[in-house]
């Protein structure tokens, strides 16, 4: 029988180890992005889990050594975590933490440290006098912000408690992804001296809501154009690139009277769906939006909405949905592998993504190349494990839509 065997050892398997797995020094996982508000204290975490003394922590920023003592920052006691006391735009960058332990040098994923902001002028109130019975829209410019804010509309009673505001605007009224509010038709019941239509933004840059613009519909005028209620386009989604796992919304918004109700097709197949389904037009928009709650690769295709209200000609709109995927692990890799000297060991790191991710490996924070290691689609194989092979093995996978990083501590008995 051969003296070597190929084994993949789970973190729960311990072969002759005197140290419990949960006490071995591994870095706590970090997020891919940390946001900060200018001048508000913010923490970049770097913590060794397990029982380990004398850990030496260092950081890089944008690939260069970062000396926190030369910046307005502090390091938490017994941790590598950085506390930016009053972060400024100049502190933005890509940070990586390194922890030197008795087992080797552990490294974090690269963390994007970005300022969150939203630039908006004080909200102004505008009075509108639309034409009765015709499609209509109220404009709301999405402000310069990071990340992109959530925009929504509500109906607000002048002088009343903001908590009494209503987000129920009625079946004829729908907010578009461009920030604007669309009326299938505007009617006399929309007129009010005391109610305002208010466009609001939510952002991690602010506590609470930020009012962007307010409108009062003072009155409606009679139509003299001869419009009969035929369907006219208001907001129609263009081609979409959607990420696996994300929410995708396809808008098919036509104005007209009576109000139509779109039917949706994917590659010619009905995808209207049922209320509560993963794909459904039943999502409180009177069918004006097809909702894909969790996008899958199979959702790629050509989508068409068709609508008729019995006045004028039926309408149709088509667009393409292209589905992409950031790197994702097929199975969560182990944080710790403990193996005997002389064994062949596989460190699992199987990744999917579209386009196919590029996978790179490090050993104790240094690029790994050739030698006794072999990279496969399922992970990294170490031939004839020796004491010098112990340490932290990092697997980083990247494509244009994201990146993932996982690190495995290999202990040799």
Curated annotation (Swiss-Prot):
Residues 1-18 form the signal peptide. Expressed in larval bristles. It comes from Lonomia obliqua. It comes from the Eukaryota. It is found in: Secreted. Its EC number is 3.4.21.-. Its main location: secreted. Glycans are attached at residue 283. Belongs to the hemolin family. Residues 25-112, 122-211, 233-322, 327-413 form the Ig-like C2-type domain. CDD domains: IgI_1_hemolin-like, IgI_4_hemolin-like. Disulfide bonds join 46-97, 140-199, 252-305, 349-395. GO terms for cellular component: extracellular region; plasma membrane. GO terms for biological process: homophilic cell adhesion via plasma membrane adhesion molecules; proteolysis. Keywords: Blood coagulation cascade activating toxin, Disulfide bond, Glycoprotein, Hemostasis impairing toxin, Hydrolase, Immunoglobulin domain, Protease, Repeat, Secreted, Serine protease, Signal, Toxin. Bristle toxin involved in caterpillar defense by participating in hemorrhagic syndrome characterized by a consumptive coagulopathy. Exhibits procoagulant activity through selective factor X proteolytic activation. Activates factor X in a dose- and time-dependent manner but does not activate gamma-carboxyglutamic acid domainless factor X. Its activity does not depend on calcium ions. Also functions as a growth stimulator and an inhibitor of cellular death for endothelial cells. Pfam families: I-set (PF07679), Ig_3 (PF13927). This is Hemolin. The recombinant protein is recognized by an antilonomic horse hyperimmune serum. GO terms for molecular function: serine-type peptidase activity; toxin activity. InterPro entries: Cell_Adh-Cytoskel_Orgn (IPR050958), Ig-like_dom (IPR007110), Ig-like_dom_sf (IPR036179), Ig-like_fold (IPR013783), Ig_I-set (IPR013098), Ig_sub (IPR003599), Ig_sub2 (IPR003598).
